């Protein structure tokens, strides 16, 4: 393992990514944060404590981002992918935390790993990310700060995830908002 190389996925030395020496888009997104999918026939319904536990992981991803947004994909109680906002690091306006987590998952698993899974994100998804979430057929979305809260600190497309989901009857999804919202908002500078 090469320890001092700069990682493609985070831009940081020694992130632990086993693909640090490869220079390709797929390698950059296939970070070791992606864990094997453990399929079980009957998963227990997540509790509020579960939601907070996984949101704390998403918040940690956000703290490590150049722009404080993080996401975690969970299937059957196991984290299968993580993502943080890399749009500034990669000069890619589509590299939102949710999109990075989805791409990392798909670099290792087929799309069936996403169907029915839960996506935890520190900010209510924008229209682009929510569209991807719906097309991936996630079963559940849990976010911290709402679009309205985020709009007090940065530009937002003022459409809620629930409104977008209501227009996608092909992709039913459960949406829970406000989980550790104060912690997510604390990552942003105060409003001017």
In which residue ranges do the predicted regions lie?
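Zinc-dependent deaminase
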Residues: 2-65, 125, 132-192
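Short loop/turn motifs at secondary-structure junctions
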Residues: 67, 113-115, 137
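Short beta-strand scaffold segments in enzyme catalytic cores
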Residues: 70-74
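A short, polar/charged loop-to-alpha-helix boundary motif
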Residues: 89-100
């Amino acid at each position: 393992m090469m320890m001092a190389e700069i990682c493609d996925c985070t831009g940081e030395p020694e992130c632990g990514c086993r693909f640090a020496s490869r220079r390709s888009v797929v390698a950059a997104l296939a970070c070791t944060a992606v864990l094997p999918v453990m399929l079980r026939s009957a998963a227990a319904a997540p509790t509020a404590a579960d939601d907070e536990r996984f949101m704390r992981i998403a918040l940690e991803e956000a703290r490590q981002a150049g722009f404080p947004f993080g996401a975690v994909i969970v299937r059957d109680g196991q984290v299968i992918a993580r993502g943080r906002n890399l749009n500034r690091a990669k000069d890619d306006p589509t590299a939102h935390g949710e999109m990075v987590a989805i791409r990392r998952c798909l670099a290792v698993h087929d799309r069936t790993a996403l169907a029915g899974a839960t996506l935890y994100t520190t900010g209510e998804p924008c229209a682009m990310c929510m569209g991807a979430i719906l097309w991936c057929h996630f079963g559940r979305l849990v976010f911290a700060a709402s679009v309205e809260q985020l709009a007090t600190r940065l530009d937002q497309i003022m459409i809620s995830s629930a409104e977008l989901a209501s227009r996608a009857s092909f992709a039913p999804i459960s949406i829970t908002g406000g989980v550790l919202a104060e912690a997510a908002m604390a990552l942003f500078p105060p409003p001017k």
